Amino acid sequence: MIITQEKNKQVVQSHDFDQVNCTIDAEDMRYVASLLRNNYSKPILAVIREITANALDANLEAGSKKRAIVKVPSSFSPVFSVRDFGGGISKEDVFGLYSKYGKSTKRDSNIYIGAFGIGKFAPLSYGDNFTCTSYHNGYKTAYNIFVDENDDTKIVRLHEPELSNEPTGLCIGVAVAN
């Protein structure tokens, strides 16, 4: 989704005042990330909506005709999961792109639902962690995305990449409370 911004804004000042661009220091990012994680009034619906929308976008981006697989929790498997058939994500992109709040690859087209780069973290509005399993270039790699004791969002790779015959894509899993 293309995010439109006013491009012809003209700011006129009566004097050449001292000024500075406002930024966020790395050590303060945890507070902003916490606000972004907790901005949903209905976290359960947000998880379903955001993860499903990302799966639809991933399939579209990859040209996949397969439907995303949505699994609802049960007493035998108390996990909500969505499996897409997009391109999957390399370790470099998980650590360099997926890990960044506000980073999105979908801002150049209106065919995608997402664009703000925060929906991927929606599961953290419901619980303190979720899993992301990537099927990419013939390998399967699982990651745990969690909020640590300092309220920082972290991603840890759970194992070395394993050979896989599974189709490319991502599977996001969110454990649910009883």
Language-model-detected regions and their locations in the chain:
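Bergerat-fold GHKL ATPase/HATPase_c domain
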Residues: 1-67, 92-99
